Amino acid sequence: MEIIIISGRSGAGKSVALRALEDAGYYCVDNIPLDLLPQLTDILSQSQSSVAISLDIRNIPNSAHSLKQTLSTLQKHHQIKIIFLEADRATLIRRYSDSRRLHPLSLKDLSLEAAIDEEYRYLEPLIQHANLILDTTHLSTHSLAERLREFLRGNSEKELKIIVESFGFKYGIPLDADYVFDVRFLPNPHWDPTLRPMTGLEAPVAEFLNSHTEVNEFIYLTRHYIDTWLPMLEKNNRSYLTIAIGCTGGKHRSVYIAQQLGEYFQAKGKTVKIQHKSLERNKKI
């Protein structure tokens, strides 16, 4: 039986994810204690082939050993995939303020901020077992559902999806990144008044960066690094590889380099999505 376990930070979108899986034909169970999972899956395996189970902080054991033991028991008999949903602290605080709901750990007389931090400490052992970590900070409900559908299709196709994204360090490092490359040491078009209003997608900025040997050398060496390890990553039964390229504001250097890397792997026949987080963020403002 295929089992998808949905977990993550409270407010990161577990309910939305579970509904998306239900729409995809999964038999869904919301919030069952982890210790009861082996018994539940034994019962469900008699009538179901695909099950999605949501776990929140209240149903995860404090002991990392107990967690590992339970997951190991399940993996002996079933196909287990764990999806962990993340969002940055400010977004979680805003979502709770908007919904006016209590955080599960607020019952321990903790402030919302303290409850969010405490929860993350509890969840850290589970993150180590996740097959997919999704940062929902900038994802709409529709986009989250689509990413999950892509993940499920990836399970059946056994094909690694590569996401190459640019970002600005001043907005924070993407939480779902597998690799983060810092390009702030490269020549910066920002200091040229004619290039400053443009982005790394525009020809004058691309020409400026392409004219510098160190930029081309960085792109070459980064391609070589990823090319070297990509076959092993593809064999590792994962669905996504997220490569994040960061500069100060996420407008020039990181955008150009992410675009170059993404197009390189597309030309090699890989399934690649290129996204520019800071550019998309600034469009919404």
Curated annotation (Swiss-Prot):
UniProt binding sites for ATP: 8-15
Keyword GTP-binding carried by entry: yes
Alphabetized UniProt keyword annotations: ATP-binding, GTP-binding, Nucleotide-binding
Residues bound to GTP: 56-59
GO molecular function, one term: GTP binding
Keyword GTP-binding: yes
Family named by the database record: Belongs to the RapZ-like family.
Function: Displays ATPase and GTPase activities.
Protein name stated in the entry: Nucleotide-binding protein HI_1146
